[in-house]
Swiss-Prot record:
Its EC number is 5.4.2.7. Binds 2 manganese ions. It catalyses: 2-deoxy-alpha-D-ribose 1-phosphate = 2-deoxy-D-ribose 5-phosphate; alpha-D-ribose 1-phosphate = D-ribose 5-phosphate. This is Phosphopentomutase. Pfam families: Metalloenzyme (PF01676). Coiled coil: none annotated. SUPFAM superfamilies: Alkaline phosphatase-like, DeoB insert domain-like. The lineage of its organism: Bacteria, Bacillati, Bacillota, Clostridia, Lachnospirales. HAMAP family: Phosphopentomut. One of its GO terms (biological process) is metabolic compound salvage. GO terms for cellular component: cytosol.
């Protein structure tokens, strides 16, 4: 018989809690997203994360851990070879990525790829380099509007991103070009993890702002995941934020797109008030997209505080047979050099009103304990070829 009727997994995108032993292999030394935010800001107003045990797990600044935490907590290492969104989320649901996705950070995309993209989209490509999304629209937005061209850029992640001004490029046309790019980059030598539409508005430099109409075109997971197993067993698998994009809709029964992380939490609170049996899987991207990549410590800290307020509302509404899991998919230390993700441990914090006391549980060597624990709870077998083991008995 299942222990929990509904499980809520909330991914605080990029909220890492310290460098993994192999982080230097990924170009990351002494990284610690949450720890360094606490160090810089000294205090954060996070009463709900505190009582769940976040500061017992990882403390810093002038903060104090809870005397009697109500959550069960540990840190998870990443077994996969990567530090990106897809690799992290796929691993949570049982897929270990051995071979990292193709990146084009150093020299941009090959001329052959760009030529094919220009031919099929009917637009000249400008940019074609690794850049911050906000900086590249400042640099090239006016040129794109004037000449009807198309800004293409990448990052240290395995992504091809296309910017389009909603007023002159047209949103549907931007999505069409991204669908073309997705097909082109299915070739092995150009195989990127995600193609992302990055729409923006504004007429001139200094006025350009990205909108919430972003859309991700991800590769399908390389195998079946815990999500497929849950859906195939007749359970609800509700996604909030970019989860549906990350899994290419695989294993999802209902999807909600979010305009922001605050909106994502509001959607989750609404879902909590409805009846369902299964999983609600949530990604809150603003920690990463707005603050981590932009190396904005204060913005990141304030985003955590905003999350904490809504976390308190959600916790009140949880039923006795609900389980809440908080985690992250990688790090993105806003105090570190560059603009890219950082290879870090992630938190695992579990809470239910029916739990008999909180405290530390054993550290785990993979994010995949999350998917394995969820399927175990519902008496569902994980698909062949997946990794991970259940820690349901510890919750």
């Amino acid at each position: 018989m299942k222990k929990y009727n509904r499980i809520f997994v909330i991914v605080l995108d990029s909220l890492g809690i310290g460098a993994m032993p192999d982080s230097e292999r990924f170009g990351d030394t002494d990284v610690d997203t949450f720890g360094h935010i606490l160090e810089r800001m000294q205090t954060l107003d996070i009463p709900n994360l505190t009582r769940l045990g976040m500061l017992n797990l990882h403390c810093g600044g002038q903060m104090q851990p809870a005397a009697e935490p109500i959550g069960r907590f540990t840190r998870l290492a990443e077994a996969s070879n990567g530090k990106d969104t897809m690799t992290g989320h796929w691993e949570m649901m049982g897929i270990k990525t051995e071979k990292p996705f193709k990146t084009f950070t150093e020299h941009g995309f090959p001329p052959e790829l760009i030529a094919e993209l220009e031919k099929q989209c009917g637009k000249k490509v400008i940019g074609n380099k690794s850049a911050s999304g906000t900086e590249i629209i400042e640099e090239l937005g006016e040129e794109e509007i004037k000449n009807g061209s198309m800004i293409v850029y990448t990052s240290a992640d395995s992504v091809l991103q296309i910017c389009g001004n909603e007023e002159t490029f047209d949103l549907q046309n931007l999505y069409r070009c991204c669908e073309i790019a997705r097909k082109i980059t299915l070739k092995d030598e150009w195989r990127v993890g995600r193609v992302i539409a990055r729409p923006y508005v504004g007429k001139k430099k200094g006025e350009f702002v990205r909108t919430s109409n972003r859309h991700d075109y991800a590769l399908k997971p390389t195998g079946l995941t815990a999500l497929n197993a849950l859906k195939d067993s007749g359970l609800d698998v509700i996604s909030v934020g970019k989860i549906n994009d990350i899994f290419c809709g695989e294993g999802i029964t209902e999807a909600f797109r979010s305009k922001s992380s605050v909106h994502g939490m509001e959607q989750t609170i609404d879902i909590c008030e409805k009846d369902f049996t299964g999983l609600c899987f949530v990604n809150l991207v603003d920690f990463d997209a707005l603050w981590g990549h932009r190396r904005n410590v204060t913005g990141y800290g304030e985003e955590i505080e905003k999350f904490d307020k809504n976390l308190g509302i959600l916790m009140e509404k949880l039923r006795d047979d609900d389980l809440l899991i908080l985690t992250a998919d990688h790090g993105n230390d806003p105090t570190y050099k560059g603009t890219d993700h950082t290879r870090e441990y992630v938190p695992f914090i579990a809470y239910s009103k029916s739990m008999k006391g909180g405290g530390a549980i054993e550290e785990e060597a993979t994010f995949a304990v999350i998917g394995a624990t969820i399927t175990d709870n519902f008496g569902v077998k994980m698909p062949e070829g997946t990794i991970g083991h259940s820690i349901l008995e510890e919750l």
